[in-house]
Amino acid sequence: MNKRELESAIVTDFSKRMSYGDYLCLDQLLDCQHPLSNPQHHDEMLFVVQHQTSELWMKLMLHELQAARILVQQDKLSHCFKILARVKQIQRLLFEQWAVLETLTPSEYVEFRDVLGNSSGFQSHQYRSIEFLLGNKNAAMLAVFSNDADKHAALKAILEAPSLYDEYLLYLSRHGLPIPQECIERDWTQPYQRNPDLLPAFKEIYDHPQKYWEAYEMAEKLVDIEESFHLWRFRHMKTVERIIGFKTGTGGSSGVSFLKKALELTFFPELLDVRTEIGA
């Protein structure tokens, strides 16, 4: 018989117990999808769920990156490795998730795009927080959140604090590696700028990985995140190109052209630059 009997020990009475749905607040979570098209367009639910689930994964990613930054401050680099490995897997999921949205055709999307108004992923507070934490800082982005005091304050705090890479460089300096002062005594609100004088420190690490094992492993974990972010940005750009072509974005950007510019941004430039020097 194609049937699995319910085991007698399985709990079924939740009148006085916390259930799966209670723990996860599923009633509230599953009541957050409110397509605005009228009559409701079938594919708008896909669009809403795609972006809401992305925000949930970004919430976890932000949680992990903030924890990693604190651990680096505390000189606990090895404790970061599992955290950053998890971040990489979250990035992989976010990358693959674009494939679901790509099932939305241009002719389908245009039928409900107007209901978005000026809302845009560019306005994602969590995404901007992640970018700032990784070092791509831009104070002008705060203006997007000028009407939300809490979000503005939270993002401003991240803007004014050292990024994860800044903390890594401070760690290397504390452990005797030749880190240029301008890399670790600077205005944290500014985006990090490539510094060729940092390469000798990274070359030392890569030439002697056993001696600097934790610093070496941390560098590779950061490169993983950098690469994954670039792949995500590229997939984002190609998905937008596939669905709306070269139309302007709902938030007012130039669309694909604006997204292409993000492909030139780097978080940890010297970790890639040093590869040319290894073995030279």
Swiss-Prot record:
Signal peptide: none annotated. Its EC number is 1.13.11.11. InterPro entries: Trp/Indoleamine_2_3_dOase-like, Trp_2-3-dOase_bac, Trp_2_3_dOase. GO terms for molecular function: heme binding; metal ion binding; tryptophan 2,3-dioxygenase activity. Homotetramer. Belongs to the tryptophan 2,3-dioxygenase family. This is Tryptophan 2,3-dioxygenase. It comes from Serratia proteamaculans (strain 568). The lineage of its organism: Bacteria, Pseudomonadati, Pseudomonadota, Gammaproteobacteria, Enterobacterales. The gene is kynA.
